[in-house]
């Protein structure tokens, strides 16, 4: 081997966790040594139109959402939820949507020779348009129970695991009081999202917010649709284990 070749840093070797992006991202967020191996330094950091580079010595470990009990995912339609376990993906973005400041922080991951690598971070404002914006709506919905009660369809479709049979699903409905009794704690300051390739169109008439437990069996899905220009919760699914 020539001297020149030996100076090149070794390429990260893929591990078993790289097969599924969800497994990888959990390891990436919880293991500092792995994280440093999987960030492409100097890392381009875009803030609006400004670009800076983060050098390895200035990198601070990023827990992403692993310090929370759950994370959230956003979809426009149900069939896109099948992308979650897809092992053929090569490009995924992890997003933080900061509800109050209306900013989105996006982490760009690429799978290179089997190993997931963070290639860039981008911070930008949420785009505004004429329709009631889902992020803005959700910030009210999560924080204000009076507003929430006006935006829950009655009766609310409810899907849950059958308490007598783990493998079957019960489909029933809830009234408003039952929704308030069964609903999960909703995030008020920021939403996470993993973009596996699903569309997230601001003009979509439907939105799905999935809440997924980290290291526990929690799983809730909220289904929203725009009715006469206003967002409304029309279906709630609780299949927690």
Predicted regions and their residues:
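Short beta-strand edge/turn micro-motifs at domain boundaries
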Residues: 99-129, 217-241
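Surface-exposed, charged secondary-structure patches
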Residues: 45-103, 166-218
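A structural feature that tracks compact, well-ordered secondary-structure segments
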Residues: 24, 42-44, 107-108, 137-140, ...
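Solvent-exposed, acidic/flexible segments
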Residues: 14-21, 98, 102, 127-134
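Acidic helix-start/capping segments at beta-turn-to-alpha-helix junctions
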Residues: 41-51, 155-164
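Sec-dependent signal peptide cleavage junction
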Residues: 1-46
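Surface-exposed beta-loop interaction hotspot
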Residues: 115-151, 155-170
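Short loop/beta submotifs within extracellular cysteine-rich repeat domains
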Residues: 33-37, 116-117, 148-151, 231-233
């Amino acid at each position: 081997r020539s001297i020149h070749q030996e100076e090149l840093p070794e390429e990260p070797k893929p591990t078993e966790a790289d097969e599924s992006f969800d497994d990888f991202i959990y390891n990436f967020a919880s293991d500092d040594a792995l994280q440093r191996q999987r960030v492409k330094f100097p890392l381009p950091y875009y803030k609006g139109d400004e670009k800076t580079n983060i050098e390895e010595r200035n990198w601070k470990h990023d827990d992403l959402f692993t310090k929370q009990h759950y994370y959230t995912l956003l979809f426009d339609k149900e069939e896109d939820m099948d992308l979650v376990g897809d092992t053929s993906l090569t490009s995924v973005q992890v997003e933080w949507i900061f509800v109050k400041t209306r900013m989105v922080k996006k982490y760009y991951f690429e799978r290179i020779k089997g190993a997931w690598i963070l290639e860039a971070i981008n911070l930008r404002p949420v785009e505004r348009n004429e329709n009631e914006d889902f992020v803005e709506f959700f910030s009210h919905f999560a924080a204000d129970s009076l507003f929430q009660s006006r935006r829950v369809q009655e009766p609310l479709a409810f899907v849950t695991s059958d308490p007598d049979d783990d493998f079957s699903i019960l489909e029933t409905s809830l009234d408003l009081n039952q929704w308030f009794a069964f609903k999960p704690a909703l995030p008020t300051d920021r939403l996470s999202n993993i973009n596996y390739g699903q569309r997230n169109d601001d003009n979509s008439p439907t939105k799905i917010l999935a809440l997924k437990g980290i290291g526990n069996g929690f799983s809730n899905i909220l289904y929203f649709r725009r009715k006469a220009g206003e967002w409304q919760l029309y279906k709630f699914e609780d299949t927690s284990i």
